[in-house]
A protein has these predicted regions:
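Conserved mid-domain beta->alpha element of the FAD-binding
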Residues: 8-21, 150, 182, 260-340, ...
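Conserved FAD-binding catalytic core of PHBH/FMO-like flavoproteins
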Residues: 112, 126-129, 135-262, 266, ...
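Acidic/histidine metal-binding catalytic segments
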Residues: 69-72, 121, 242-259, 315-322, ...
Length: 422
């Protein structure tokens, strides 16, 4: 089968490798230039979290070891507030970790791996201008295929052309907050996600292999304490110092970095159907989500594994319908979880009641066989997102009883167990 994959990002390259290894011929069409070239622009230092779903996909194609070689394990989050830092572990043992990876480095590794597969051809600088059936048109050439995959991101061209053929539902939602990235020099305890929850903003920072952190500040776009109201250096400096405390001590040039670029937008995409007449969407083209659960790339990798399996099990036409049926309900759940986690990171990590509930949930995960936190099911397993949420709801109904009837006693017993006392 001849396959054209539009987009040479994470999902496109991952899928190309998988399909080519099954014997399909794959052309990957990318509008940008080759990022591996000598004249490629310098890549931004974006770091992202690699969870078990993403690790499983990389393991399948033999790239996990290479990806982890420059990754930094994140065993929990460190929350900074009022000059103090508290540690919240992600899992119950050393296997339940996330890994911070540089997006650019991982994309290069995937491109190199795709280029090494004889049945894959990479076409850079080819912008898709039309789609007729399974014929993909660019100004330079036309690609004929048996299957077209749109892996071209939240602003997908393939999706636009697909929607001209079929009655489609489409929802693009922008958060009224934006983001700006900056670099934090080396800090203590780098093997964690660092969070500064302010009253009017949020900073999240991923660790890098050199000991530094890649920070992201999230603020409203508008208002006196939003990006639009903080363009003056003195005003921005005063706000950042008041809102995020010790962060300004860690980053002497925080204000210049904060003002260096325009803030980016945060977008979520939902659409249906994902497929029609041998054209299918994967990754952000099908289900872009807000970044606050750290699952965008991981979900895209999982899409590739599921689509690959469906194509192996069914005829191409049936495979695409089976893929959408298996994935779309769960990525809809992920979109809800990602939006919800924004509220948790921004507001609830400061709440004593919320933190107590989290501690009880975490302790039950250590003491009660079969009990897993929602975060653990999402980040440390491959349980479908919807199944994980349903299981968490069942547990939380029980947890309400624990909180009312003995949560404090349970925590005290757990502390005694850890300290070796009876």
């Amino acid at each position: 089968m001849n396959v054209v994959v539009v987009g040479a990002g994470m999902a496109g390259t991952m899928l190309a490798i998988r399909l080519a290894r099954r014997g399909h011929r794959v052309d990957v069409v990318e509008r940008r230039g080759d990022p591996r070239g000598m004249n490629a622009p310098e890549a931004p230092s974006i770091s992202i979290g690699l969870s078990e779903r993403g690790r499983a996909a990389l393991r399948d194609i033999g790239l996990l070891e290479k990806a982890l070689a420059t990754a930094v394990p994140m065993r929990g989050r460190i929350v900074h507030r009022s000059g103090r830092a508290s540690y919240q572990p992600y899992g119950t043992d050393d296997t339940e970790v996330l890994h911070s990876v540089r997006r650019h480095d991982l994309n290069i590794a995937l491109l190199d791996a795709a280029a090494s597969v004889p049945r894959v051809r990479l076409w850079f600088g080819h912008r898709v201008t039309g789609l007729a059936g399974t014929e993909v048109r660019t100004p330079a050439r036309t690609f004929s295929a048996d299957l077209v995959v749109g892996a071209d991101g939240a602003y997908s061209t393939v999706r636009t052309h697909l929607h001209r053929r079929v009655r489609a539902e489409f929802h693009r939602t922008y958060l009224d907050w934006g983001y700006q990235e900056f670099t934090i020099p080396a800090v203590d305890r780098p093997e964690a996600l660092h969070v500064w929850p302010g009253r009017r903003g949020l900073v999240v920072a991923h660790p890098n292999a050199d000991g530094s952190l890649t920070g992201t500040v999230f603020l409203p776009f508008d208002g006196d304490t939003g990006f639009s109201g903080l363009r003056d250096p003195a005003r921005a400096g005063a706000f950042l110092a008041e809102e995020f405390g010790d962060l300004t001590d860690l980053v002497p040039d925080l204000v210049p970095q904060f003002l260096a670029h325009e803030p980016g937008s945060l977008v979520s995409v939902r659409t249906a159907p994902w497929q029609h007449d041998r054209v299918v969407l994967v990754g952000d083209a099908a289900h872009a989500v807000f970044p606050f659960y750290g699952q965008g790339m991981n979900a895209a990798f999982e899409d590739c594994a599921v689509l690959d399996a469906c194509l192996a099990e069914h005829t191409p036409d049936d495979a695409l319908a089976a893929f959408e049926a298996r994935r779309r309900p769960h990525t809809d759940v992920l979109a809800e979880l990602s939006a919800r986690n924004f509220v948790e990171l921004r507001d609830r990590v400061r709440s004593p009641v919320f933190l107590a509930r989290k501690r009880i949930d975490f302790t039950l995960g250590r003491l009660v066989p079969g009990w897993r936190t929602l975060y653990a099911m999402i980040s440390h397993s491959s349980l479908p997102y919807g199944d994980a949420l349903a299981r968490a709801h069942r547990q939380h109904r029980l947890l309400g009883g624990f909180v009312g009837l003995g949560g404090v006693t349970l925590l005290a017993a757990a502390r005694r167990k850890r300290s070796g006392r009876c």
